[in-house]
């Protein structure tokens, strides 16, 4: 019962916000964006702009110590403590939208070319229950899903939390085996996909180090 109540309380506002951002709609061929903006600056959807709140992460720095919730186990996960493997962080506003769904399918399907030693992780502010449902329906349960649903602490600690919506900005972050951030792309126009192929190539290079 508690799970159902939590799902309803959080799920409906998140869907309405995502729809307002223009991510949802019929599936179509998605454009990939090669450009990036810095965490802590701003992103856009058409003429609308969204300031990125919080403390920006940077290349060569470690991830902040923040607890996320694993969708499958409901256990807390602190990615700053996860060393020994390359982390491929695919960060999306909401899995209940077409662009975010496409990004996650790309991670799960095209990402098979990347070594299994690279941990492919999707992070969003969807509830863990919504993430788990998506994973099962999309047949992408081999990915790890981490939820920032409580307070948006991960978004604020990385400079990736969009104002007005309080959703995470569409981005990819790669962390090397020592826990250092080595790659960041924050998509300037959130209706476009990140350059997943470039990120895959970089992840493979980091895995060989």
Q: Residues of each region from the PLM?
A:
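Thiol-/selenol-based redox modules, centered on thioredoxin-like
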Residues: 168-209
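Residue-level signal for well-ordered, solvent-exposed loop/turn and beta-edge residues enriched
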Residues: 74-75, 180
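Short, small/polar residue-rich loop motifs at catalytic or cofactor-binding pockets
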Residues: 62, 86, 167-169
């Amino acid at each position: 019962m508690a799970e159902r109540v939590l799902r309803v309380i959080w799920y409906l506002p998140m869907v309405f916000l995502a729809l307002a951002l223009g991510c949802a709609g019929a599936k179509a061929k998605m454009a990939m964006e090669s450009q990036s903006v810095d965490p802590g600056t701003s992103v856009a959807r058409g003429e609308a702009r969204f300031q990125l709140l919080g403390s920006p992460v940077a290349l060569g720095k470690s991830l902040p110590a923040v607890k996320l919730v694993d969708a499958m186990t409901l256990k807390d996960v602190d990615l700053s403590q996860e060393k020994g493997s390359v982390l491929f962080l695919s960060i999306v506003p909401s899995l209940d939208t077409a662009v975010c769904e496409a990004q996650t399918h790309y991670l799960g399907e095209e990402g098979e070319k990347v070594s299994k030693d690279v941990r492919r992780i999707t992070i969003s502010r969807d509830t863990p229950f919504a993430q788990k449902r998506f994973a099962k329906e999309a047949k992408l349960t081999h990915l790890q899903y981490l939820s920032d649903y409580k307070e948006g602490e991960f978004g604020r600690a990385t400079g990736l939390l969009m104002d007005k919506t309080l959703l995470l900005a569409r981005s990819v972050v790669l962390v090397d085996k020592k826990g250092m951030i080595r790659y960041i792309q924050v998509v300037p126009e959130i209706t476009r996909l990140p350059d997943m192929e470039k990120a895959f190539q970089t992840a493979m290079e980091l895995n060989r180090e």
